[in-house]
Amino acid sequence: MSHAKQLHNRRYLNDYLEIINREGLPGNVKSDLCLQVQDTVIATVQHVIEEALAEELYAYLGLARYEHVPWGRPPESTRSGSYQRELITQYGRIADLRVPKLRRGNGALTWQSITRYEHCWGPMLDQHVMGYCLGHSLRDLQEAMALTLGEVLSLAACNRIVLRVSKQMEAFKQQPLASPPPIVLVDGMWVTIAYPTDEISADSQGRRRAVKRKQKRVMLSALGVWPDGHWEIMHWQIAEGETADTWNAFFRALYLKGVTEQTTDLVVSDGSPGLESALDYHLYGVAHQRCIFHKIKQLADYLVFGALEGEEAAVEAPSTRKAKQQRKKAILADAGWVYDGESEADIRARAEVFRDHWQAREPKAVANLLLDFDKTLAYLTIDFPLSLASLIRTTNLLERFHKEMRRKQRDIGMFQSEQGCETLWYLLSRRETAKQRAALSSRL
């Protein structure tokens, strides 16, 4: 049986973590002094929280401990010792936190320091969720939490901690944008998700499990760019493919968030099928920018390598394969040079030079570059800072975000549910948003 499957066995997992704790950690982490410091920190945290609870009770009653009043106190205003409860913090586990209580009416007492059923206090869970966002698997999260909590949580419990963010995710997806961006980048990324079937099988532990089959789905996503240069992921939606119907549903959701014809100046895409009709229906009249990067990249699919023999002799290339690589590199470089122009007139003039130079040898590639050429210059027709043109004439910003998601998908193999996939998408998007806002604040 593989190591990954044996980790589902609680006894095996406990022994595995004990070995890590005993032999896998540096000596300074296991030293007596380090453990003593840890105990002192936990005791200090416990003292501070208990003092905060005592201050809260004083503010609630308006009377100090042992303070008498002539008319006496009702049970609802009389202290009655304390009870002990467990609390887990980012510093460690507090086994016997003393919480003050009243003789009667404890249900009406609302604590601010800790909530009634709060088991994990402070940013401890947030830190582990961020670890998952940064690339830790659920088993990595399980091991990290075991070192903090001193006990082992099941994989299902770790998964519930991550999925707890799903409520925030749903609220974010339905919340209208406070300030809709003038530039919207849209694209799709294919993901692998496991879906349950009607079959039931028994695992190695004899437990009955629903059989899942992996299926391909596309995550449609939208990224907004503002004139100050910062950008954010605004919306995403799982679909079976990039069709007119799925894009219509996607832009309908964006419209409800406040992305309308009045707020949007430009939509940037890579020419996905079905996108044009959805744009005409929901954002009629809005300029549509075709991604320049994809436009140039696709030229390689239309190369016919005409007159390669003469070119091969000119460069003294020893092989046809090397000559083809040189041809591809040269024509892509020239296509990129076309879009280096600073104005529309300059770019069109460069396009004519490109056509004259390559028409005889690569007619299909030249025709593909000039097809819908006006759509690749749509970014020049709107009122937006030219210094930010590189951000709005391609979908590279969105592709960069997709790269992070692909890395995570490679780590985990496939997502076990649509909810898990969307939750990770939300976590990564919020992380990128925080980085963008921090960078914006530093520039102000």
Features from the language model and the residues they span:
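Conserved beta-strand -> loop -> alpha-helix junction used to position metal-binding or nucleic-acid-contacting
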Residues: 266-273, 278-333
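RNase H-like nuclease fold core
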Residues: 66, 73-75, 79-82, 93, ...
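Short alpha-helical segment immediately N-terminal to, or the first helix within
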Residues: 130-134
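Residues in the helix-turn-helix
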Residues: 52, 140, 153, 157
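DNA-binding alpha-helical recognition surfaces that contact promoter or target DNA
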Residues: 55, 143, 160, 277, ...
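DNA-recognition alpha helix
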Residues: 139-150
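Short, conserved DNA-binding cores of transcription-related domains
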Residues: 2-115
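Acidic/histidine-rich catalytic cores and adjacent linkers
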Residues: 1-32, 55, 63, 337-444
